[in-house]
Amino acid sequence: VTYTLTVKANVVPDGEIIRCWLPYPREDNRRQKNVALLAVSDSEYTIAPKNALHRTLYMEKKAVKDQQAVFSFSFRYTSAAEWFNLTDEMIQPYDTSSTLYKEFTAERSTHILFTPAIRELSRQVVGNEKRPLQMVRKIFTYINNNYSWASAREYSTVPNIPEYVIENKHGDCGMVSLLFITLCRLNGIPAKWQSGFMMHPGDVNLHDWAEIYFKGIGWVPVD
């Protein structure tokens, strides 16, 4: 994989420092391994720690009048799909006093909020179900069947993204993931946001998805 970022000539005044952060693979995820840096355009660079949430390779250089500034690096890694053949019997009761449980079942402004609209939708979709796996399946199936994909507005212009999805009957990957995360958290299932690049050969794109936590299993990706 090669990332290249080019700053056009004279966009930055001559002599000023241009700072560049390019995405670098995390190595604390079991779905990707064997990360190897192959080449870097600059001799001086910094790679963020392996567990950084937004891991990057950082470079900087002075702007030169009438010259482009090019930042580039290449790496390779091994990726794999991850699939869980889950059953209710595999999932242990949550430790509701744990730090993990409290953090990932809590509201988080401005989008993960247990509003009246979210609570009402939860009553309709989840009903009286108490088994974590079955609650997740109900939430996932409902969202998948009722909200079509649509290109998103700039997220910062939407006051509450899950409610936007409910009201407009559509959303992009991140929007429906936020609705899924919010409904899971409301029902006591730890859930969190994930984001990264889809590295399809010749068709790189950004993507968002969710992960949910089952006691005895760990974090499970949901897309």
For each feature predicted by the language model, list its residue ranges:
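Intrinsically disordered, low-complexity N-terminal segments that are enriched in acidic
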Residues: 1-83
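Short beta-turn/strand-loop junction motif enriched in small, turn-promoting residues
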Residues: 6-10, 127, 198
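Sterically constrained small-residue positions within well-ordered secondary structures
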Residues: 11, 50, 64, 164, ...
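Terminal peptide-recognition signature
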Residues: 20, 139, 210
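Acidic low-complexity segments
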Residues: 49-53, 65-167
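Active-site nucleophilic cysteine motif
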Residues: 132-139, 169-184
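Active-site rim elements
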Residues: 167-169, 197
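Hydrophobic/aromatic-rich core segments of domains that either
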Residues: 175-223
